[in-house]
């Protein structure tokens, strides 16, 4: 009994330590970027709805799940409202870098039930589901790949940034078209893009279509 109690107390102490570190890191971030509407400026000025900032809000919402604080929600809503709860570069973007922010919008939708959020997300995904990455629509990331209706995720980060948006929409609406299309896009990235971004032999993903064989690092190894 004493051993079990000690283990429980140790586990709780470790959990508290982790939470305290997360709070400190987030407090630093929110103090440094006190105005969430300001653009980012890392070698280039970009809107704060860019993926590099969007992934922070994913983490903030996860922190809010275990450490609920109104200031987390207020900070997030200021950011999202400034960007009109819309993907970076608008409804007609097919770039996962632009869509990443929608993950947080949909998390907030579960709480505020603002139907406009769902409408914008549905419009964006609806556009993508009808738009192939052909010459007319190609971006810098998709040029050089075989045109496909499912061929927008040519780098593996995109799977993390955009696939959850599809699955969130499936869960929120019950419409299987979001789940099914996302899985087709995932399989295209895994099995077809550049000959397939997943190396079944090593069990690792090549970073993007530019790094599949015959590309090698200077030491002759594959680049993951």
Segments and roles (model prediction):
Residues 12-224:
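Glycan-recognition and catalytic cores of secretory/periplasmic carbohydrate-active enzymes
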